[in-house]
């Protein structure tokens, strides 16, 4: 599990390689990642936008920006948590991701909530020549 804390708000990430959605012979590798955001602060916050930096095994980066997560812009109250799962494809068998969420407080103050750098690793895949 990967963890980052910003302003008493914790972001936990659990990546998982999905062999059933991957085709190594076609250079297609797929991971799911589960995110838990825990508001340990005194104020409610709303997740407005996301920004991801995805790096493949060759060091090539792709940036993804968008509104909310999985179609939602959740409000997370003090002591509450929000969880979701999404996925990412790569053309290499490993890589990593990091990023941030733009959060807004009840007073309208915007700040970036850090998403920890996490690794995308697939198990060793042995190739057989026939």
Swiss-Prot record:
Cited PROSITE patterns: APAG
Gene name linked to the record: apaG
Top-level taxon of origin: Bacteria
PANTHER family in UniProt: F-BOX ONLY PROTEIN 3, POLYMERASE DELTA-INTERACTING PROTEIN 2
BP terms from Gene Ontology: error-free translesion synthesis
Domain ApaG: 3-127
Native source species: Afipia carboxidovorans (strain ATCC 49405 / DSM 1227 / KCTC 32145 / OM5) (Oligotropha carboxidovorans)
Protein name as catalogued: Protein ApaG
